[in-house]
Amino acid sequence: MAKQNKPAIRFKGFTDAWEQRKLGEVVERITRKNENLESTLPLTISAQYGLINQNEFFDKRIASKDVSGYFLVRNGEFAYNKSTSSDAPWGAIKRLDRYESGVLSTLYIVFKISDERKTSSDYIVTYYNTDLWHKGIQAIAAEGARNHGLLNVAPADFFETNLTMPKDYAEQQQIGSFFQQLDHLITLHQRKYDKLQVLKKAMLEKMFPKNGSSVPEIRFKGFTDAWEQRKVGEVSESYSGGTPSVGVKEYYGGQIPFIRSAEINSEITELFLTEEGLKNSSARLVAVGDILYALYGATSGEVGRARLKGAINQAILAIKPHTDYDSEYLAQWLRKSKHSIIETYLQGGQGNLSGTIVKELSVDFPSLKEQKAIGGFFRQLDNLITLHQRELEKLQNIKKSMLEKMFV
């Protein structure tokens, strides 16, 4: 299909082959300076957020105080940021949608659609969300000429790069509109997800006692008793596992999930042990619901609840609270305290935690009934966060797939 210049997926009623155009044939460069100070809003381009207020994005002002020599960009106009990043290996091309106008450094290449009756602005936005244009930039960027991540791309060469597009404006518009709606849905779910994360962080601060206090700021109705402080080791049994010798193939490939620290919240594992591997090593079994605490490396301080019955290695501490203590409550406290634990016990984030350190941690506990109420509240909140995260990932995967199949 691609050889015929037709995409794999199209809207009904469109059959013509797409055409290849030079960017400069459908857009025109803008070199308008901000001489009359029409705008004092400094902009930057983020691969994720598009054209955005520079002060908010960097949390400080990067632009000069005098912006009269900057390009003036108006709503609906485009800009190419030649700076590269992991998200934008060949820079980013975005349209100004958030503000009526703003100013950009003259290092950017600014342009607008020449004739919006023939070229859909939304289509151009979407096209530059694909990676189809990267090859053209790669061809014109001067070899080795990267100055602090800034590509050496001349404006004249930039406008000579190719893009493919439907001849029919109606098809362009439908494609652009489809992705604009998809982006709107993604933004809605992202906002809900972000709000829930902020809510959880705030409630974790308010529903557990602060240092020096014996009660929290917010409590469920009906609970008035003071809380008591106990060490993790006093209220639970805990143990770490081990790793069977990797050179013995008979120890691996069995039916026992082998949970490693990056998998403490996962329902699947990459490795499986045999009964022989379990027997001939320090690996220990855990049950569904056990608290799993990561001790080593990049995941130090991460907390999970076992999603499956399996074995753990030495990088994980399994914690099983006694019957008077709620697992979910303790897991939430450990999550809330991750930053302070890392700061206290790991110098500069380096090194490992240990079972001894975790068992000595002091935790504030209310009655079991109140623990269960708090743990249940945060479990529901976590489920809601996970739901929005999955929806977000699903929509992002749909977008990625459609960007690949609806363009040539």
Language model features: what each stretch is:
Residues K3-P7, G102-L107, A142-E171, G310-L317, ...:
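A short glycine-rich beta-alpha junction/loop motif
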Residues V67-K135, A154, R260-A262, E270-R335:
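A short beta-sheet element
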Residues Y127-N147, A331-G348:
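Charged, low-complexity intrinsically disordered regulatory segments in eukaryotic signaling
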Residues M1-E19, D168-E228, K369-V408:
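Amphipathic alpha-helical segments with low aromatic content
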Residues G24-V27, K118, N162, A287:
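IQ-motif-like calmodulin-binding regions
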Residues V27, K33-A63, V103-L104, G233-S236, ...:
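DNA target-recognition patches
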Residues I62, S68, H148, N280-S281, ...:
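A structural connector/turn signal
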Residues R10-N34, R219-G242, E267:
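Non-catalytic DNA-recognition/assembly elements of restriction-modification systems
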